[in-house]
């Protein structure tokens, strides 16, 4: 293990993330690269803090290099999110992929991934769906018929994402070893807190809730001191995400769309565009919109991502299947020479990358549009164009 990659959101970066970086150093990682969601996040929202703040927090805690997981690929299913992250880290030259998991052993996760990628899986899934099971339950049941034990693995969020990483490595033929790490402290997506090595830990979702309800100081017990100082400064400058601005922006933009426009979106079809059109015309808040969209057929997470795709006009066709460039958001200067060995266009300026290769324009513009939208949803609204003008963070 020499060059370790992590796929993360850091929404926000907290003490559990810092502990993970320390664990990787203790296990022998000489260089750690992070592929981080930018503009938007996988749950169909905007990050609580802008990219530069999260990048600085990660570098201060021990990361060597932070590259962008561009917005269209960040707001995506677990499968697409994982595929994009693996592709970028493999292109960067990482030899190991580290991630948190409830089952921190590679073999069971790899076996489940192999079952999901097998030629027999589509028929097994179809059989379970025909029995009336919802998609997630049908998927787990189908996997269980091909790989005993897979259903249990597919019940927990970090294992699910870990299996998607394994699938991506298999399908892409990426030369990366797996390093699943035990998830320590608080469970994903809960209000529980924990303590490891004397450090209080909480999930990112709980920290976000604390900040939204009690202010930035409420995050202090759960984030490194250096990060906390960055977060205080960001809050003073109005850079925190404002849920009310997000809600208003989403509804405003959705109400300008026609059903025909919505039908061309990624993830639309099967009447979802009509359901979204009707819900947007009646909803009073974005949460009310999500409630109106709810259906047994579609997971809430998918509907949230569809809403954001509609806001950003992410098309069903035309976007490259995988990110076509490596955009460095921040780095220690000693890590920059690694870019010379990248297998896809790489650099520290989005404008520079597009200037070198115009074929990158579509993905770059989609990424820029999402960053612009995110800046609209801050307590202090920021100017447009930051994705193309931002300076790389160097330490």
Describe every region a protein language model picked out.
Residues 25, 59, 89-90:
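Non-catalytic positions within long, well-ordered alpha-helices that form the structural scaffold/packing
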Residues 28, 62, 170-173:
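A broad structural signal for alpha-helix termini and local helix breaks/kinks
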Residues 30, 64, 95:
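Receiver (REC) domain switch/active-site residues of two-component response regulators
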Residues 53-56, 60, 338-342:
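Acidic, Ser/Thr-rich peripheral helices and adjacent loops at domain boundaries
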Residues 56-70:
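A glycine-rich helix N-cap at a beta->alpha junction
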Residues 68-395:
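Active-site cores that bind ATP or allylic diphosphates and position pyrophosphate for catalysis
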């Amino acid at each position: 293990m020499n060059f370790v990659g992590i796929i993360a959101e850091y929404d926000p970066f907290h003490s559990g993330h810092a502990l993970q970086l320390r664990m990787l150093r203790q296990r022998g990682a000489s260089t750690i690269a992070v592929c981080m969601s930018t503009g938007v996040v996988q749950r169909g929202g905007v990050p609580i803090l802008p990219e530069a703040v999260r990048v600085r927090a990660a570098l201060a805690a021990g990361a060597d290099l932070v590259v962008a997981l561009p917005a269209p690929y960040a707001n995506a299913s677990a499968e697409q999110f994982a595929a994009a992250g693996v592709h970028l880290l493999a292109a960067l030259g990482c030899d190991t992929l580290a991630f948190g998991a409830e089952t921190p052993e590679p073999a069971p996760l790899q076996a489940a991934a192999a079952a999901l990628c097998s030629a027999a899986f589509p028929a097994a899934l179809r059989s379970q769906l025909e029995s009336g099971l919802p998609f997630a339950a049908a998927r787990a049941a189908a996997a269980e018929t091909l790989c005993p034990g897979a259903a249990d693995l597919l019940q927990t969020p970090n294992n699910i994402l870990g299996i998607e990483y394994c699938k991506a490595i298999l399908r892409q033929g990426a030369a990366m070893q797996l390093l699943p790490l035990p998830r320590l402290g608080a469970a994903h997506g809960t209000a529980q807190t924990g303590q490891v090595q004397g450090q209080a830990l909480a999930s990112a979702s709980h920290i976000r809730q604390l900040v939204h309800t009690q202010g930035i100081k409420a995050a202090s017990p759960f984030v490194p001191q250096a990060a906390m100082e960055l977060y205080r400064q960001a809050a003073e400058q109005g850079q925190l995400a404002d849920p009310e601005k997000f809600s208003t922006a989403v509804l405003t933009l959705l109400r300008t769309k026609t059903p025909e426009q919505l039908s061309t979106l990624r993830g639309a079809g099967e009447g979802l565009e009509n359901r979204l059109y009707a819900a947007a015309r009646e909803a009073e808040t974005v949460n009310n919109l999500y409630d109106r969209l709810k259906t047994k057929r579609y997971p809430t997470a998918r509907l949230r991502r569809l809403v954001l795709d509609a806001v950003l006009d992410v098309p069903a066709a035309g976007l490259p299947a995988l990110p076509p460039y490596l955009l460095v958001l921040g780095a220690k200067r000693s890590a920059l020479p690694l870019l010379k060995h990248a297998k896809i266009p790489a650099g520290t300026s989005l404008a520079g990358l597009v200037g070198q290769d115009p074929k990158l324009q579509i993905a770059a513009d989609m990424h820029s549009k999402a960053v612009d939208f995110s800046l609209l949803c801050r307590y202090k609204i920021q100017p447009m164009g930051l994705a193309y003008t931002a300076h790389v963070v160097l330490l």
